[in-house]
Amino acid sequence: MTTDLTGRARAQADDLISRLGLAGDPLGLGGNPGDHRVVVAMSGGVDSSVTAALLHHLGYDVVGVTLQLYDHGAAMAKKGACCAGQDIYDAKRVAEACGFRHYVLDYESRFREAVIEEFADTYLAGFTPIPCVRCNQTVKFADLLTTARQLGAVCMATGHYIQRVDGPNGAELRRAADAGKDQSYFLFATTHDQLDFLRFPLGHLNKDQTRELAEAFGLIVADKPDSQDICFVPNGRYVDIVEKVRPGASRPGEIVHVDGRVLGTHEGVIRYTVGQRRGLKIAVGDPLYVVRLDAAKAEVVVGPREALEIDTIALKDINWLGDEAPLDGAPVRVKVRSTRPPVPAALSVDGDDIRVVLARGEEGVAPGQACVFYSSDDEDRVLGGGWITSTSGGSGGSSGVRLIG
């Protein structure tokens, strides 16, 4: 069965689509859906496949695009990867079964430069990167949007769990209805111009509803497992990627207590992140955690759990999605990790310098991660965010990172 359904199967699919609030023109383009060409970014997973099948079923002129991002043996065959061999094949089979055009674009060189090399360099500098945000920020929501426009599309749709709403001052980004699947943390860097062109038709669904749609359309990926966060890291061994991309760049050094005592040695700061407890390989009586990393001195600084607490976060490369410019002292809610809920904070604004002052201390906030802003009045609305460069205050003092060079 495909999305070219007839009789009872089509009636059942139409009923499900209606119950899920997806009937008619879920992209909000107006007019006849068939007059609108929509590029769908297809990773080969169930979410993007359902997005493409749904829009095709509703009559939009769908063009599926899958990016070939990397090609190394273990990742090509591993379960839970995306944009590699099996996933490209799955995306192509979905498109063929549904009857819409599908293209595979070779972005491997661009992905290596913008994501993989940046991933390695970030670890070497003592930061903890989020490659999925960089991929969205550069490859998917910059380069691919340009390609979509060249293909004559009026918008690009993805299978992300996030909501785009037309507000009084333009398009707004909002958290997904399913808090457990919400991907707003990874999409904070989406710009106003990109948001105008993007659509997220699954944003108000949960995963069970998405899989129900996949089954109604008869998609071969209906039971496919979700993709993992870092698609290009085989078996979760990110250190292997860093050493392959930058051979010999990681230096051994000392593990130092916050009180100045040298407790042991390590094989490179790339093996550690702020908040880490396991794998320190030092014999001490009390539990110790990584408090900060000094890449210039090749030091891993450790301390008791209370030394992890901070209350001030310095940021760079801020993307602001609010209606008005950020004001000094403005209340917001922020997420400092994807799995943590938004917490109360205030912005400290001095010209182009913006810091976040938390209402309560947070532990394990790592430079290199994202700090994402949400409205204090409506915490579902995403106001943007920035990259964490350093932290201070609380019981933990400063955990800024000294850059190499």
From Swiss-Prot:
Biological process terms in GO annotation: tRNA wobble position uridine thiolation
Cellular component annotations (GO), alphabetically ordered: cytoplasm
SS bond list: 135-231
Keywords, comma-separated and alphabetical: ATP-binding, Cytoplasm, Disulfide bond, Nucleotide-binding, RNA-binding, Transferase, tRNA processing, tRNA-binding
InterPro entries: MnmA-like (IPR004506), MnmA-like_C (IPR046885), MnmA-like_central (IPR046884), MnmA-like_central_sf (IPR023382), Rossmann-like_a/b/a_fold (IPR014729)
Pfam families in alphabetical order: tRNA_Me_trans, tRNA_Me_trans_C, tRNA_Me_trans_M
Region feature Interaction with tRNA, mapped onto this chain: 181-183
Residue ranges the record marks as coiled coil: none
Cross-referenced Gene3D superfamilies: Adenine nucleotide alpha hydrolases-like domains, HUPs, Translation factors
Keyword check for tRNA-binding: yes
Principal EC category: transferase
Active-site residues annotated for this sequence: 135, 231
Reaction catalyzed: S-sulfanyl-L-cysteinyl-[protein] + uridine(34) in tRNA + AH2 + ATP = 2-thiouridine(34) in tRNA + L-cysteinyl-[protein] + A + AMP + diphosphate + H(+)
Major subcellular location class: cytoplasm
Sites marked Interaction with tRNA: 160, 369
Places the protein is found: Cytoplasm
Amino acids binding ATP: 41-48, 67, 159
GO function term, MF aspect, one: tRNA-uridine 2-sulfurtransferase activity
EC number: 2.8.1.13
Described function: Catalyzes the 2-thiolation of uridine at the wobble position (U34) of tRNA, leading to the formation of s(2)U34.
Family: Belongs to the MnmA/TRMU family.
Protein name: tRNA-specific 2-thiouridylase MnmA
